[in-house]
Structures are given as structure tokens and as C-alpha cells.
């Protein structure tokens, strides 16, 4: 908030690279606030409105704004709102503020996961699962998220392979705690409780 206030008072003091960094930090702030139960819904809404105002003032695409709103709506259990924001997200063009092509689709995969639209989740994830797009956290992050969709849509072998490949990549990364949770859920559902307990014991220090 300090950097944003300084930019609003003296925009000429920021070069293009610093402004771009501010765009990214602001969208991350909205995501973190939305996931923190200690931050009130009203405060999150204020941040969303400020994000839109900031992006519009710089002529940025609303793609990121709609994407963040969709994610926050999902966290708040507002799936109709999430669906509307996702539709707007798909309809707006990506720009330099958007997540990479490997990570950006996770918004729709997450929505499909929450609403049990298993085929949509798998179809959205295909470019990442096939290696057509990737980054430092992909495909392993998406692989963990689609474990249940793969299983529920009748692809048990693909789910097991995704589990093995994803876990191999995340096992040394404490920042992948959420991904680990998907693996534990999957292992419980397929009756591999022994392996699930083994992974839980191995990663207790992440908690």
C-alpha cells in the first residue's frame, strides 16, 4: 500500500519496470488477502475495486482483474459470481500483467474442480498436462489439482501417473503445501492410506 500511495502521489518517480512490478504486487496482494480469513470481505472488496482502478488508470487489460475476482469469489463460496468473472476473464485479452500460459488456466481448472465439472477441469488442463506449455511450477501444480477430476472422470491410470510425476517435483518445495493437500486427498480416495500417511509424516514440518 505504501508503494501504491507513493505512485499515486508521484507517478513520474516510477520507471516502466517499477510500474509493471507494482501491477504484479498489487494482484498478488488481492490473492493473498482473499485467502486470509482474518481479512474481512469488505476489505477484500475494497482491494478488488482499487486493483481495477489502478489497472484502468494505466490502460491495462481487465483480464487480471476478472481473474483475481473469480478466484476470490471461489474462496468466498460465491460460485455464480466466480462463473461470471471467469466469463469476463476469458473475454478479455491477456497482457504483460497476466500469469503465464501455464498458470493462468488454473483459475478455470480450480472453478471446475469446485463445481465438480470434471471434464471441463481435465480439458482446460490438457495443454499443461501434455507439456505444450510449462513454467517453473508447471506442470506439477496443475497435475496435483486435476488428480480428483482425472479420477472422477474415469481416468484412474492418468491420475496415478499425474500423482507420481507431480509429487516428484513438489516433494522438496515447502511452498507446494496446497498441492500436497490434493495428493493426500487423492491417496485417501483411492485407498492408498498407507502412502498418504507416509507423505504426511514426511512433510509435517511444512505445516
Give the label of every model feature segment.
Residues 1-8, 35-50, 73-88, 112-126, ...:
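Helix-turn-helix repeat elements of alpha-solenoid scaffolds
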Residues 133, 149-179, 187, 191:
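N-terminal low-complexity, intrinsically disordered segments
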Residues 40-43, 55-63, 68, 77-87, ...:
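Alpha-solenoid helical repeat scaffolds
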Residues 5-14, 50-60, 87-99, 126-137, ...:
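Solenoid-like repeat scaffolds
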Residues 181-207:
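Long, ordered, amphipathic alpha-helical scaffolds
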Residues 1-2, 6-32:
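N-terminal membrane-targeting/anchoring modules of bacterial envelope and secretion proteins
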